UniProtKB/Swiss-Prot annotation:
Similarity field: In the C-terminal section; belongs to the GTP cyclohydrolase II family.
Source organism phylogeny: Bacteria, Pseudomonadati, Pseudomonadota, Gammaproteobacteria, Lysobacterales
Organism, scientific name: Xylella fastidiosa (strain 9a5c)
Pathway(s): Cofactor biosynthesis; riboflavin biosynthesis; 5-amino-6-(D-ribitylamino)uracil from GTP: step 1/4
EC number of this enzyme: 3.5.4.25
Highest rank taxon of the organism: Bacteria
Protein residues bound to Zn(2+): 225, 236, 238
Name of the protein in its database record: GTP cyclohydrolase-2
């Protein structure tokens, strides 16, 4: 059995973070991972998102039909289950198609037999998060009769996840490169690329103008949104917030925009587009994510904090409508002296989304007031593909 080694006699020994990354890569490619807890219990786990009907059958046969489906608390709640630790649902009598419906269908048949999840399931779910997969797990406890089938699989001790998580909050991000880039309407900027965290993803800081780093620096912490930032989606206000945020940084004499690789509130682009499908049938953005097993906001701001510290910034004016973001940055040691609203546009397509952010995520926007103060004769700039757009003033108080 491929048991993890925690002492490294040579300079290229594995670390907890590297073992977590390898486990995430294995799940993403549709292979099982073995988890070991403090009592040496072994569980084989696979991510349903990367399974096929064939691999499901192979897994079931290998574990002697002792496998179960683990659903997160968010998805369990959708199914009407009171399961604050998530729910394990036995699969011995369920087909692959039935399993998929139970994990993802909007109105599935509710399971009658289940037990609460435990630390193994929480660990497996965390690995799927690292892999940007949907958090539904097919797993089974192993015995000496069944573990031989998984002899070549990646093994991960649960303590590795704890160690990696603890290290993520203290490990500095490496500054990889920086260079000037001229931007339309903004003049010369500087793009600074950092690398760090689990999966060693590249994150970008954009320095606008010449801010005084000894004072409270204007900062926009912006999570990537492919559909809104790049393609101008009308379903959200992300693209507007990006562009208006950059313009505000310039107007304030300079600042920093942190562009974080956290698509879909940290769930990934595939999950985001899947959630759009649920929104098309009437669910709001938070309930749509819950259908897939996600909480209201899976984003983490450790990377943002590390980047600010690397730039020598500890005091900021935060451009955001989200008080929770202020709280998280303050909890990490960043002094947020002021929150400045970032106002975008309301369209017929994104008004429900914005109201949901206010009513369910605590964002600070008076949407009705903003609509009332923006009524004026329509001009050609206020239409997009024939759709009327309600412009919100780019300045003012939210």
């Amino acid at each position: 059995m491929n048991t993890p080694t925690h002492t490294h006699p040579h300079p290229f020994g594995s670390t907890a973070t590297i073992r977590c990354e390898r486990a995430a890569a294995e799940l993403r490619t549709g292979r099982p991972v073995l988890l070991i807890d403090a009592h040496t219990r072994r569980h084989a786990v696979m991510a349903l998102d990367s399974m096929t009907a064939q691999s499901f059958t192979t897994f079931a046969n290998a574990v002697g039909n002792t496998h179960y489906l683990f659903l997160t608390p968010a998805r369990s709640n959708v199914l009407g289950l009171e399961a604050p630790q998530g729910a394990r649902i036995p699969l011995a009598t369920l087909s692959y198609d039935s399993l998929v419906k139970l994990a993802y269908l909007r109105q599935p048949t509710h399971p009658t037999t289940w037990v609460p999840g435990d630390i193994m399931d929480a660990a497996a779910t965390e690995i799927t998060r690292l892999a940007l997969l949907l958090p539904a797990i097919v797993a089974a406890p192993l015995t000496h009769h069944t573990e031989h089938a998984f002899a070549d699989c990646q093994t991960l001790d649960l303590t590795d996840l704890d160690t990696a998580a603890a290290g993520a909050s203290t490990t500095e991000y490496e500054l990889v490169t920086r260079t000037p880039v001229p931007l339309r309407d903004l003049g010369m900027s500087e793009f600074i690329v950092f690398r760090g965290g689990i999966a060693q993803r590249d994150q970008v800081a954009i320095l606008i103008g010449q801010p005084d780093l000894s004072s409270a620096v204007p900062v926009r912490v912006h999570s990537s949104c492919l559909t809104g930032d790049l393609f101008g989606s009308l379903k959200c206000d992300c693209g507007d917030q990006l562009r208006h945020g950059l313009a505000t940084l310039k107007a304030l004499g300079g600042g920093v925009l942190l562009y974080l690789d956290q698509e879909g509130r940290g769930n990934g682009i595939a999950a985001k587009i899947r959630a759009y499908g649920y929104q098309h049938v009437g669910l709001d953005t938070i309930d749509a994510d819950a259908q897939l097993g996600f909480g209201p906001d899976e984003r983490r701001y450790t990377g943002a904090v590390m980047m600010l510290r690397a730039l020598g910034i500890t005091r900021i004016q935060l451009l955001s409508n989200n008080p929770t973001k202020v709280e998280r940055l303050r909890a990490a040691g960043i002094i947020v002296e002021q929150r400045i609203p970032v106002i975008g546009q309301i369209t017929e397509q994104n008004e429900y989304y914005l109201r949901t952010k206010v009513s369910r995520a605590g964002h600070d926007l008076d949407i009705d007031a903003l609509i009332m103060t923006s009524q004026r004769p329509q001009d050609p700039s206020e239409t997009v593909d024939g759709e009327t757009v309600k412009s919100i003033p780019k300045t003012g108080h939210a």
